[in-house]
Amino acid sequence: MPAASAPILYESHCHTPLCKHAVGEPEEYCEHALRRGLRGIIFTCHAPLPHGWSADVRMTDAQFPEYVAMVERARAAYAGRLDVRLGLESDYAPGLEPWLEALHRRVPLHHVLGSVHYQVRFYRERYFTGDVFAYQQTYYEHLAQAAESGLFDTLSHPDLVKNESPAEWHFPRIRPYVERALDRIAATGVAMELNTSGRLKSLAEMNPGAAQLALMAERGIPVVIGADAHRPDRVGDGYATALRMLQEAGYREVNVFLDRRRHPVPIERALASLA
């Protein structure tokens, strides 16, 4: 076991009540980050989208300044104790690129997650035909397109679609499509997330699972870990398990984004830093 070291990791994926399905004020999330032995926290609440795109699970465009102010309030309150940063989780689907490009330029952001949320109504209405396997293929095609768009730092929970119908998730069958998508993603340099909240979903394992993570490692795709916290007590949850899973897949480093620049951290050092 490595000797304890100073805090170095960040919670790189967490939310605020503005998304309508998270609870707790930013300051409460910050308190849990300190208890977990984290150096900082990057709020990445669900970004507003045009035309009422799944408005029930995200802030409105009019609330965006309020979101920025909430994070700034927490940053000021924890100055000198915890590094609090502003980010976003932005949904990707073809056609949203112009909106997202303009949104991401409004304020300085530190980490921009790109997500394909197969379960939201607007996405399902456009892409689900009733064929689950075809939907899985579409999901990976859109992940690759998200990376190629240049809009995102990290692709979040990048096998989320397996929860659409766990009984119809057979990785050997989808693997050729996954590999083609990962080849395209690797060519962009965009990172991918190991999301610990997958353990709480219908198919209870990390997002992605071990098989996909190994394919990512083979291609040298950088990884960021995040808990996808929608309540304060989930900040930093499962980080030690995630780091060991990365090691088992062949990774030696984990990454943090600050100022939208990727900073690698040795996994052994990261493990030693956790409370």
Give the role of each language-model region:
Residues 20, 106, 114-219:
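Domain-core and long-helix interface of multi-subunit machines
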Residues 1-16, 26, 169-275:
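Charged catalytic cores and adjacent phosphate/nucleic-acid-binding surfaces used
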Residues 2-9, 34-35, 68-81, 100-113, ...:
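Acidic (Asp/Glu)-rich catalytic clusters
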Residues 22-32, 95-103, 138-145, 178:
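Short, acidic/polar
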Residues 14, 46-47, 90, 116-117, ...:
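Active-site metal-binding loops of divalent metal-dependent hydrolases
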Residues 1-90, 94, 164-173, 231-237, ...:
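An N-terminally biased module of ancient metal coordination in phosphate/nucleic-acid-related enzymes
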Residues 7-11, 40-42, 81-87, 110-113, ...:
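Structural preference for beta-strand elements that scaffold enzyme active sites
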Residues 73-129, 133-134:
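Active-site gating/metal-coordination segments in enzymes
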